[in-house]
Every structure is written in C-alpha cells, then in structure tokens.
Amino acid sequence: MLIPALDLIDGKVVRLYQGDFAQKTEFDLTPLGQAQLYAQAGAEWLHLVDLDGAKDPDKRQQKLLAKLASDSGMKCQAGGGIRTTEDLEALFDAGIERAVIGSTAVNQPDTVKQWFQAYGGEKIVLALDVNIDQSGNAMVATHGWQQASTHTLDDILNRYLDLGCRHVLCTDISKDGTMTGTNVELYKRYKQLYPQVVWQASGGVSCLDDLKDLKAVNCDSVILGKSLLTGAFTMQEALACWQNA
C-alpha cells in the first residue's frame, strides 16, 4: 500500500529536512484540499504528523485532524507527541483510525504495553526512526531524532510483538526528506526477520524506481511525503507503478 503523508504546523503543510524545525519548507496548499486530491487518485490511507503536537501536546491541531479524518475520503493514521492515554484517546475521538507512537514506545514501555492490551494491534503503529551505526545495527532515536537511544530496532520490536504489535513505520533518518533513494536493504532485512509485521517504509523515496525496489523486497507499504509535494511523481503514477511492480 502507498500512504501519502502530510506534516502539519499551524494548520499548514510543511516538510522538515531530517526532522529539523529550522530547515522547514512550507507548501502553498491546504491540508484538506491536498488530502482530497490524494483520495481522488486512489489512496486509501493518509499519514498525518502533527508537528505542533510533537513539540507541545497542548498545541495539538485537534480540529484539523478531525476535519481530515472526516472529510479527506481516506482512513487516517496520525502521530506527533502522543505521550499519555488522554493524548491517545483524543486522537481516536477525532476519528483517527490508528495512532502513530514513536518516542513513547521507546521511553515508556509499560504505558505502551497497556495501550496494546486496551486497544489492540490494529489501532497502533509503532514509528521507529533509526540511525544505522558503523556495525550495521539499526539504532532507534527519539524525540524528533534529537536524542539517540541505546536500543536497537529489534529490542523495541521484541517488547511489543507478543502483545499484538502488527504495524511498524520505520524511517532511516539519514534518508528522510533528502530524496536520495531509500534504504532498501533495511526493509529487506527486517521483513525477512519479522514477516508477521506490516512494514511501512519511510524516507528518501525520490522516483518510481524506488517504489519498485521496495516492492521487490516485499515491503508492505511506503509513506510518500516530499516526493509527492515536490512533483517528483503523482499519486496516480505511484499507485500504477506499485500495482504493476
């Protein structure tokens, strides 16, 4: 599946370069209008990142998320600063189908284990952002990549798989927002290690050949952000490529 993404600050569509708020590109389009274009092209899911909420949960763009959930024509998964059960329930109340949990899954495992038990694996996407170290280990970073952790991707996955964890969005930080190609080997390796996981690849997709390469290693889904917004290809072209790859 191909999942278009919108990153949101103050009601506007933006892109950050490698998670850096100082390296922000703002796009002259409305979130709802852009989402509806993706839906008309055939996309079924939309990935939303509330960057205001990520910085300060009190500034979550709740009304906008609810509007996108109700009017975009797609099912939505959303993340950005989900730290408490109240944060999580606010998203579900807004009509978001799946909550995307990142740093909290690394730093508050007991809380997130409770969420898997309460809501089930279909309602939660683990967002694990990794740096590949010199030994080839996928090391998880947290808090918008500002903090490195001592945990590998495997460490975090193994906490939650027995609790029904099914959806994992994995970003190679070195690729994000760069449009320099995707880390195909990373997704190939982890799909082979954890075939039961529905993997969402994110970061670096720059051309349709990148999609073919990911499909060839059985990656389940791909998040498309900058490549669509900058016109590298259209949603229609991407979907046709994915179906025929």
From Swiss-Prot:
InterPro entries: Aldolase_TIM (IPR013785), His_biosynth (IPR006062), HisA_bact_arch (IPR006063), Isoase_HisA-like (IPR044524), Isoase_HisA-like_bact (IPR023016), RibuloseP-bd_barrel (IPR011060)
Signal peptide positions (record): none
Molecular function terms, GO-annotated: 1-(5-phosphoribosyl)-5-[(5-phosphoribosylamino)methylideneamino]imidazole-4-carboxamide isomerase activity
Listed EC numbers: 5.3.1.16
Pathway: Amino-acid biosynthesis; L-histidine biosynthesis; L-histidine from 5-phospho-alpha-D-ribose 1-diphosphate: step 4/9
An example Gene Ontology biological process: L-histidine biosynthetic process
Alphabetical keyword list: Amino-acid biosynthesis, Cytoplasm, Histidine biosynthesis, Isomerase
Compartments reported by the entry: Cytoplasm
Catalytic activity line of the entry: 1-(5-phospho-beta-D-ribosyl)-5-[(5-phospho-beta-D-ribosylamino)methylideneamino]imidazole-4-carboxamide = 5-[(5-phospho-1-deoxy-D-ribulos-1-ylimino)methylamino]-1-(5-phospho-beta-D-ribosyl)imidazole-4-carboxamide
Active site residues of this protein: D7, D129
UniProt KW Isomerase keyword: yes
Major location (coarse): cytoplasm
GO CC annotation: cytoplasm
Family classification: Belongs to the HisA/HisF family.
Designated name of the protein: 1-(5-phosphoribosyl)-5-[(5-phosphoribosylamino)methylideneamino] imidazole-4-carboxamide isomerase
Protein source organism: Idiomarina loihiensis (strain ATCC BAA-735 / DSM 15497 / L2-TR)
